[in-house]
Amino acid sequence: QWKDGSTSWERLADLKESHPLETAEFAMTAGIDHEPAYNWWVPHTLKKRDRIISMVKRRNTRYLKRTHKFGIEVPKTVAEAHDLDRKNGNTLWMDAIAKEMREVRKAFEIIPDDQTAPIGYQKIPCHMVFDIKMEDFKRKARLVAGGHKTEAPATITYASVVSRETVRIALMLAALNDLQVKAGDVLNAYITAPCKEKVWTVLGPEFGSEAGKGAIIVRALYGLKSAGAAFRAHLASFMRQMNYTSCKADPDLWYKAETRPDDDTRYYAYILVYVDDILCIHHDAMSVLDRINECLPLKPQSMGDPDIYLGAKLRETRLPNGVWAWGLSPSKYVNQAVQNCQTHLTEKLGGTFKIPAKAANPFPENYCPDTDMTDPLDPECSSFFQHLIGVMRWMVEIGRVDIAVEVSMLSSYLTLPREGHLEAALHIMGYLKQKHNSRLIFDPTYPLIDESDFPEHDWTEFYGDVSEAIPHDMPEPLGKEVDIRMMTDSDHAGCKTTRRSRTGILIFCNLALIQWISKRQPTIETSVFGAEFVAMKHGIEILRGLRYKLRMMGVPLTGPSFVYGDNKSQVTNCSVPESTLKKKSHSICYHAIRESVAMGETRITHISTGDNLADPLTKCTFGAKRRRLLGNILYDLYDDFN
């Protein structure tokens, strides 16, 4: 019944989607929550409501309740900072405030006493946030604007974030073309950019004698919704002044054609931007950083060889074959995550759950999260489980390929996790505690590819005169060429409840692992043959995007990508023109893969299951098989000192 007294019939599914809470509460009040249309959905919806309310309450009180960090009392206001310094007999907090104000003062333009804020400008609050650095317990103060009071800008609001696969490609190219890699961190990055919003504020006590005066915010102050986009635009204008061009495949990668002075060979220099972290790849990278420093001040201690990037330790390594290559090691991030997890279990959850002392593998043998029927977690434990999955997914992104399939499996239960799922996540943390050392090396060495394993055929009769689409606006290819290989696999009906299969994909540029995927397939396949088709089609689509990105980065790419699969029937069906379509349900995958082969974009061959490195991304593996396959991907993981 509507407010005007009229009535109408509405689909229950529509009401569940548009007004879930009201519908669930009505079912409870009317006593029909036991009906088939409600019996599972109502308690799930109400539990979700309670969880959201609980999380909001915790977030509102978390900052106020936290009084200490690393055993040091942290103030909430400038007045409290003064009191703490007087009580402790030092000026540590006031020094931190003074340091912040020296940098941020230029972001404010005082409004004369006889004037008011310009018409159209919105008043917002500003406040000081305090923190303590873990490395040296140094006090830190940051003045932030109350951007939550303003409307979201119509244009983009995000900062520069270069993709992870672009970082891996760039590091491999640096070693391949013998280029330097240097890093820099922009000092107070957002403050260097002009403010895009019309806002003003009343200055607080941190401004000293100017406290109480009105001021227009003229710089992209931290906290403003447009601050990230403002800095991004400011940085982009400077990159263009340096004659760098934004890559169309990844706008936060900037490239420029350069000539090496020692042998006059031409190549592309790259600048990668991740918010305020800059990675420069050039034959004289420090000179580029010095020029950037003239416009965007860089932290002096950050300029030079890279140390930590994206949460992982980045360093150059000499391989057994004598080649120098860059590698990412997330060991420090892993150790800190395990330590934080142990602290939370002890202090917040009262020791109810524990990290196992020994865990040789990410999952216990014979454990399956799909069939776990333990009790659902309460809201606090559910939130902790979701936090753990987020942390471990980032570990996978920065190189822990060995836990990819287990984390992917648990990620399917974020909305309704059970006690067994949390215990499985803690088992992964126990495994990481034991196997914390690992390195992902971006080896530029060319792989040994026997092209006789990839026979060519005439596909004209079946697909006509097709050819790979080459971007018309790609830059001139410079530098050394790369080879691309992909290994695909699937675990047919691996999910015990939905019977969906799991895809595993590994993509290499030369010997450098660039992309990896462990993901449930969207369809339910009735055969191993069909699941392998879906996996390879997914891989072909990713390969096409990677080939486009490489070309838009100016990387020479003349040959096809070499694809390996371990299902001989499916490989033959894809690579031999006369092979026929066996099921109509496979027609899209069948033609998509075969057309890729016909246009010369890919070539496909068979590989034994024992040699398929993508196998550990489709299902949990154990013992010698796991050591052999993952040992070919990650360095240090199974070394004796681990």
Where are the predicted features?
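Mobile genetic element proteins and their domesticated derivatives, centered on retroelements
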Residues: 11, 78, 97, 104, ...
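Catalytic-core region of right-hand nucleic acid polymerases
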Residues: 20-21, 28, 108, 116-118, ...
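Conserved beta-strand/loop block within the catalytic cores
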Residues: 90-168, 246-274, 450-451
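A short, polar/acidic, helix/strand-boundary loop motif
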Residues: 151, 507-534
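C-terminal reverse transcriptase regions that engage the nucleic-acid substrate
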Residues: 168-171, 221, 304-451, 608, ...
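RNase H-like nuclease module associated with reverse transcription
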Residues: 412-416, 483, 522-642
